[in-house]
Amino acid sequence: MRICGIETEYGCLIESERVAREFSPDTLSILVKDHLFYANDIGLLDAQYRDRGEPPRNGGFLYNGGRLYIDMGHVEYASPECLSLRDLIAYEKAADFLLLQALEDLGIRDDVTFVRNNIDHVTGATFGYHENYLVSRDVPFEYYMVPALMPFLVTRQIYAGAGRVGFHEEDPYDEDDRRRRRVATRVTDEVPYQIAQRSDHIVADQYEWVQ
């Protein structure tokens, strides 16, 4: 039997000028998180530092076994470990419901939208939907794992990806371009839609980083 889980990062879109004058997406994300923990009592906030970027009360464990927290200004949700894909989808939908309920409680459901997101249109960064595969350290990663996983990770964009409207106009290979942050998302007849959201951002077949 295998366990599975999912991690989702939510972008905050403020569609109302009235709300935008009072809140930024970052502060609104914190407001929603605090409302869920304090008013709706969905779980227990962390009492201690978990990391340099995760101070006390930045987030916490939910009573359903998952976690909800603020990561670099946006709401992030991690499901509990699940034994079936049906349960996994149910827990992911539960996160959507929690955010909608908070917006409803705060009276801003028609003014604010939380969307599952893995592209930052301001900085050009890509993130989210991390996956973990438990294997022995004795397994040669580059010789076994990469050849086995790479075709799956690439082709699943076709049948399981959400796609993307438009394209990103930053050259990831151009250091001067990146420093200038010449970032824009455009929709044109030339590139109206892409199958994969991250195609404009990924420049390496694999990247290894230990935190």
Model-derived features with residue positions:
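Acidic/His-rich structured neighborhood in mature extracellular/periplasmic domains
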Residues: N132, V139, A148
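Terminal catalytic/cofactor-binding subdomain
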Residues: M1-R116, P147-V165, A184-H201, D205-Q211
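Hydrophobic, small-residue-rich alpha-helical packing segments that form membrane-like cores
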Residues: S136, A162, G166-D174, R180
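Short coil/turn motifs at secondary-structure junctions
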Residues: E15, S136-D138
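Histidine-centered divalent-metal-coordination microenvironment in nucleic-acid enzymes
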Residues: N118-S136
